[in-house]
């Protein structure tokens, strides 16, 4: 198992605070099964996998922000569709 140095990952992201944010968001995606790892898992924990992805340049702040925005839009659309269905059903009952 190759070791991940935080310094290499910090160089890819910009500063250690952003690294913590990006790595934790990515690790959560991997841990919950929402996204597949982009590197070999090698029996590593999600946080180590996330750091390895960042170090390899496969995950950046921009990629995570775009992913989060797309996920939020998808969730908003689903919620609006559900509200429209409820409102549509109530209007039919009143008629």
From Swiss-Prot:
Superkingdom classification of source: Bacteria
Entry annotated with the keyword Glycosyltransferase: no
Gene3D superfamilies reported for this sequence: 3.90.940.10
Protein's GO biological process: DNA-templated transcription
Keyword annotations: DNA-directed RNA polymerase, Nucleotidyltransferase, Transcription, Transferase
Summary of the function given for this chain in its UniProt record: Promotes RNA polymerase assembly. Latches the N- and C-terminal regions of the beta' subunit thereby facilitating its interaction with the beta and alpha subunits.
Assembly and binders: The RNAP catalytic core consists of 2 alpha, 1 beta, 1 beta' and 1 omega subunit. When a sigma factor is associated with the core the holoenzyme is formed, which can initiate transcription.
Matches recorded under NCBIfam families: rpoZ
Name of protein: DNA-directed RNA polymerase subunit omega
Lineage, broadest ranks: Bacteria, Pseudomonadati, Pseudomonadota, Gammaproteobacteria, Alteromonadales
Chain's gene name: rpoZ
